């Protein structure tokens, strides 16, 4: 059996794979910059080689549609699923974290949010959304972030309907005497030890693939390249979306997130041309072929090294 196939099968079987999560990864990575729509049969064809049947796909699509993440249209007996406005908005928000090439720059300022008069349920929901955006809880009603823009946070608060119940402050970096205490507080409030462990697990899972891609280069078919890319982004996404993406100045020494990101970039650059061609071959929309990726697709990870000639060689 091919070494790459063995790796792919091991990655699929290592942990339980949620259908809704995997297909969310597929839409975000392969379809969101190509119109966001695809025929159900095409999705089944893309995932068949990973051992996921049509029932798996149908169940996941049904749930994503029910959650308002996907829209569905039917032409005859065919069903086409596309990203809804909600799905596209959440996808764009996520990809700003997933495809970063480096830690965010920092001007030394902190954004502080103090919540007032919110019931426990609403407060818990707002805190969950803010934590996803990189905030940490300094106190039960006080959230802080060193890297969020006020305009983005205000949009989130308005969407949640709590803008009138949250007071926003801006603060400068603490004085030099406070830095040791600050680092300790940051590590605790942002759960950096647990985040670092998740990155280490990702590295252990995908680092063996780097030499395999060199040793078994002739085994890298477009289908295998797509499967590798999907699994890579799926598992990386699960880790990086929990990362607050703190500035370099606030991270502990030997932060595994740097290694994990570079590992992901290196593998992604290697398999992307063939994976892109495979999606083009199998993908079908309600009006025919999938459109070519938009320009933002090629800006991922600081810029993808994909030439048109490299894509064409996999479609011949």
What residue spans do the PLM features occupy?
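Short alpha-helical segments that sit at the start of domains
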Residues: 2-29
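Short acidic, hydrophobic short linear motifs in intrinsically disordered regions
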Residues: 34-46
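Glycine-centered, phosphate/nucleic-acid-interacting loop/turn motifs that mediate DNA/RNA or nucleotide
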Residues: 68
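Amphipathic alpha-helical dimerization/coiled-coil segments
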Residues: 96-138
């Amino acid at each position: 059996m091919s070494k790459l196939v063995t790796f792919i099968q091991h990655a699929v079987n290592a942990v339980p794979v949620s259908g809704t999560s995997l297909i969310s990864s597929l839409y975000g990575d392969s379809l969101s910059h190509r119109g966001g729509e695809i025929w159900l049969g095409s999705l089944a064809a893309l995932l068949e080689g990973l051992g996921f049947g049509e029932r798996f796909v149908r169940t996941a699509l049904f749930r994503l549609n029910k959650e308002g993440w996907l829209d569905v249209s039917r032409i005859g007996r065919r069903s086409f699923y596309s990203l809804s406005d909600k799905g596209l908005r959440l996808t764009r928000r996520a990809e700003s974290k997933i495809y970063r090439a480096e830690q965010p720059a920092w001007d030394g300022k902190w954004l502080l949010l103090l919540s007032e008069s919110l019931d426990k349920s609403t407060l818990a929901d707002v805190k969950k959304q803010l934590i996803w955006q990189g905030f940490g809880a300094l106190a039960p009603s006080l959230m802080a972030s060193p890297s969020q823009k006020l305009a983005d946070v205000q949009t989130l608060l308005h969407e949640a309907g709590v803008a009138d119940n949250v007071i926003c402050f801006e603060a400068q970096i603490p004085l030099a005497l406070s830095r040791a205490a600050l680092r300790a507080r940051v590590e605790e409030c942002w759960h950096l030890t647990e985040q670092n462990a998740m990155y280490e697990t990702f590295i252990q899972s995908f680092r063996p693939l780097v030499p395999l891609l060199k040793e078994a280069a002739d085994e890298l078919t477009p289908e295998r390249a797509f499967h590798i890319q999907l699994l890579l982004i799926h598992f990386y996404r699960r880790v990086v979306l929990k990362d607050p993406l703190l500035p370099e100045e606030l991270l502990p020494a030997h932060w595994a997130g740097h290694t994990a990101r570079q590992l992901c970039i290196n593998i992604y650059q290697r398999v992307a041309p063939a994976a892109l061609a495979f999606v083009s071959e199998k993908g079908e929309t309600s009006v025919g072929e999938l459109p070519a990726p938009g320009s933002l697709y090629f800006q991922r990870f600081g810029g993808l090294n994909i030439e048109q000639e490299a894509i064409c060689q996999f479609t011949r």
